[in-house]
Amino acid sequence: LKTFRTFVAVHQGDYFRTLADYRRFMMKQGFQTATAPDDAFGAIWCAWGYGRSVQPQQVYDTLPTVKRLGFAWVTLDDGWQNNVGDWRLDPKKFPHGDADMKAMVDRIHQEGFKAQLWWSPLSAVPDSELLRDHPDYELLDRDGSARKVSWWNSYYLCPADRRVVEYHKALVRKILVDWGFDGLKLDGQDMNGVPACYNPAHHHAQPEDSVEALPDFFRAIYETAQAVKPGALVEFCPCGTAFSFFTMPHFNMSVASDPTSSFQVRSKAKTLKALMGDTIPFFGDHVELSDGGNDFASTVGVGGVVGTQFVLPSLVTKHGKSDLTPAREQDFEKWLRIYRDKMLSKGQYLGQLYDIGFDVPETHAIRKGQTMYYAFFAKRWKGQVELRGLEDRNYSVVDYVTGKSLGTVSGHGAHLPVEFDGHLLVEVRPQ
């Protein structure tokens, strides 16, 4: 009798311990994780708030505010390209082509930032020159029709075709070397899985070759990025859909990926930290996607990297939750200062201490050195909270958002009476 190699585990608490055990089990089978540079933990400003119609001048005019608030990365999102597939520069925005894009990256660098570029690999719009000149790149269905990506108006390219891989490797070199970007933001709900390919031009041994080749496709992108720019940031955002464990070795930043609530930010953080460990940064995505559009606490409290897509109201004609009003700017200043001071994104996330489904209030714990950090979340809470994971010693407890002392606790399983609305973030330091 021969079976597939199988992982079986008995749960203790929620899913965190089992997923972490699975990661360790896979590493013993030769599974390797990516490595992230130290600057990957810097806060991110993304130009997506300006939409696909973003203009270079809007980016330039926003940089002083981005710098004053303390962000480390500037991301140029969707809208720089002529179309999805050809990935040439929009001539209306970059009339001098590569020289204009390089000048933008140089300007971003001169202001002290790292530069990241949005890109959606493995898809192409129907009227792209790529598909006109290379229709044999397409991933085809059993009846010979092109497979459409459900969200984009695009067709799948086949990751098992060597020419498709080489085309994308050349794009990586252009983005990171010719234009000078420091990182990639890979985006698209099609990135975590592709259908079987029946394109006869690809000479597949079986239609499922495309499915099995997908992790190797992203390996090629990641390894090319690291070869041409060691330490390059490769963020992987599957647009609100699930991640594939087998692509995880091939990117060095995970993300909450278009969350629709703050709970999704926190639960995705717990899941991805279990599967990828603490050395790979988790980006909480743009704060505008969280509850109220301003819930930095959910990202900071779980050890995530903070980010935003804010716009300057004076630079847009349509206004919304991305507008950086004076009140929001004060809030941003406070949370960016907290993020930089604590840098919990570099701490050890202790997901095994609390059950996200049954422990009330919802609690997350991070150890950094000898200090413990706890994040409590509830619509409204008045009562005791348990501080798990402490040693048999005395600790001082402080609300690190307000700076207010909450007293002292002692020993294992310490309890603390608290009252809060929404969230409470505390630092527990040995005396």
Model-derived features: where do they sit?
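C-terminal beta-strand-rich structural cap/linker in extracellular carbohydrate-active enzymes
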Residues: 407-431
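Aromatic- and carboxylate-enriched substrate-binding clefts and catalytic-loop regions
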Residues: 70-282
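Short, acidic/polar
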Residues: 53-68, 164-177, 292-296
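Composition- and surface-driven signal marking solvent-exposed, interaction-prone regions
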Residues: 19-23, 59, 210, 386-390, ...
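Short, surface-exposed loop and linker segments with low hydrophobicity and enrichment for Pro/Ser/Thr
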Residues: 37-40, 206, 210, 418-420
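Active-site-proximal substrate-binding groove within the catalytic cores of carbohydrate-active enzymes
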Residues: 217-404, 415-417, 424
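Conserved structural scaffold segments of CAZyme catalytic domains across common CAZy folds
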Residues: 1-116, 122-125, 129-130, 137, ...
